[in-house]
Amino acid sequence: LDKLESIPGFSTDIGIEEFMNQVDEIGLAIVSQKKDLVPADKRLYSLRDVTGTVASIPLITSSIVSKKAAEGISSLVLDVKFGRGAFMKDIGSARELSESMVGVSNGLGVSTVAVLSSMDRPIGYSVGNSLEILESVETLLGRGPADLEELVCVLGGLLLESSGSSNDFEEGAARILDSLYDGSAFGKFIEMVASQGGDPDLFESEVSLLEGLGILDQTLKSDSLEAKQIGWIADIDAMAIAEI
């Protein structure tokens, strides 16, 4: 959410009624947690924090699934990260969490699937809120990095299949890919930005977007790191990059 809020004026803090109206009108909304939506979750998290159970898989499951189920959804796709840059450091723990969330969610009548995706290395080329928004816009215009585009198509394809909006995953993923290249995904994103207080005019040109995000700034500095020897970059530690 903090990435989206790097867009000037954009707010994820909207009321439940406004949230529901926006979904009815344009088909999507991205909002922060509300005190009147699963209010027990915040209290439970406070208890987890002081009892050393933040990493408890059953409690993580209840926290995540309760918010999704409270929205009254019929289908859900979960992107469960694992690796150095993720909360779950190994694929075994991520798989255990995935199975727990899928089981509970399906038991509540929500058609749910989970994808395990690695966060050992950064996804895409950018790190940082504004830079990642810029890269997301490039992806919505069909010009994004291949790994990010693939993840978007996999998650979107599974959701279309799960919701019955496509006959199978392949058709769903193809439709998502088409939306990235025909401009419809970007257009829908602009609708959401405008509905949640952001300035859609920022996205009219690359220069206006760079200025709006504070990236086109003379105070920005860059440094060059010279390799000590000739070779290939074999690995990039996502957590080390995040901590810079």
Mark where each language-model region is.
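Active-site cofactor/substrate anionic-group-binding motifs, chiefly glycine-
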Residues: L1
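Phosphate/pyrophosphate-binding betaalpha-module
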Residues: E5-E71
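Well-ordered secondary-structure scaffolds
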Residues: T53-I60, K67-A70, S74-I244
